[in-house]
Amino acid sequence: DNFMYIFKRIIQKDNFISSIDIDANFNISLYINKIYNSLELENLVENIGSEEMEKKLGKLFFEDLFNLYRVKDKDDLFNAIKNNTQSTFLNLRTKVDIDEFSSGEKQIYILCLYWALLKSSEIEIPFIIDTPYARIDDTHRNNITSEYFSTISDQAIILSTNTEIDEKSYKIIKPKLSNEYLIEYDNKNKKTIQNKGYFFEV
């Protein structure tokens, strides 16, 4: 629930992700609700088989099929699918291939996992993030600025360049900041200099 809440707030795409599943070994799978007709299911059974179906479509896909066909094992399930003479449509949770995400979508996915883990732990710890917008487009940058940083923790430390948090993003996040520091390397004196304020204010 925590993951889906923040992911939807940031990604803001319809029919992109419907649910998340985390197994006992902390393997994470994302799912989307998808409509299949009985002929599609029969073709899947005949063409790719049980093992490849579960790998491609996910554990929850089979859980839904077991419940809908009221069977308990795959042999009975496949027989039921093959013997189904009626044309029916089924809404099934289908695994999403994360490898097909764009670089920005993958980064948002990881950021949201961190957010969900922190919220689920119910432990308040500082959150530190470096170059938060590396592959993120402008729309999602604004969503991360307004929805993510101010809610992930009571103390968030953001290490950013002036091109990442530009003047537009800075105006959004400014009211929520406690302190700002500009850290620069002094080549002449071979040392790091720290000043109060952000790039636009120093």
Language-model segments: which ranges?
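Charged, surface-exposed helical/loop "interaction arms" that form contiguous linear patches used
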Residues: D1-I11, N15-F16, M53, L57
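ABC-family nucleotide-binding domains
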Residues: D130-R141
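Nucleotide-state sensing region of NTPase/ATPase domains
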Residues: F7, Y36, L41-N43, K174, ...
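C-terminal lobe/lid and adjacent interdomain/linker elements of RecA-like ASCE P-loop ATPase modules
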Residues: T139-V202
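Intrinsically disordered, low-complexity acidic Ser/Thr-rich regulatory segments
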Residues: E63-Y109
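Long, charged, glycine-rich C-terminal linkers/tails
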Residues: I11-I35, I128-P132
